[in-house]
Regions:
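Conserved AdoMet/S-adenosylmethionine-binding subsite of the radical SAM
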Residues: 1-104, 109
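A structural motif corresponding to the C-terminal lobe/cap of the Radical SAM core domain
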Residues: 83, 90-93, 99, 115-139
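C-terminal accessory region of radical SAM enzymes
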Residues: 67, 132-149
């Protein structure tokens, strides 16, 4: 069983990347795809990068029927708003290959790494989400499509 864990940010249909990706997909059973934010502008604020390639990669994987698990890190004050979660749900519903959706509660375990490298931690002061907010996100992101599989 071969699994790739990725956010897909490097995805492009340009060559030589795309033909190499197609070859790799022949040997890949499934992917775990991180979607950190459904809104492009908010994704840029959270990660410093656009989500356009990530969402296009998800569509490509759906087109080729490659099974995926969607993973969403729930970050208070960033991605933990019902509006964004509902938009993510609606996007997931457009995909035909989703086997599972996981809500990953944000944590601060890696904050020390930033400090050791002399960088400011961009999420300093943000606490992990409450149990209630995680349950809320799970409720919103449940989709009838993947629950039937």
């Amino acid at each position: 069983h071969t699994n790739i864990d990725t956010c897909g940010a490097v995805f492009t249909r340009e060559e030589p990347f795309f033909s190499k990706l197609e070859e790799l997909m022949k040997y890949t059973d499934m992917l775990m795809l991180d979607i950190k934010h459904i809104d492009d502008e908010q994704h840029k604020i959270l990660t410093g990068h656009s989500n356009k390639n990530i969402l296009e990669f998800a569509r490509y994987l759906s087109d080729i029927k490659k099974p995926i698990w969607i993973r969403h890190v729930l970050v208070p004050e960033r991605s933990d708003y019902d509006e964004y979660l509902e938009r993510l749900h609606d996007f997931i519903e457009t995909l035909d290959n989703v086997e599972k959706v996981e809500v990953l509660p944000y944590h601060t375990l890696g904050e020390y790494k930033w400090k050791e490298l002399g960088y400011d931690y961009p999420l300093a002061g943000i606490d992990p989400p409450t149990k209630e907010r995680v349950e809320n996100a799970n409720r919103i992101l449940e989709t009838a499509k993947y629950l039937k599989k």
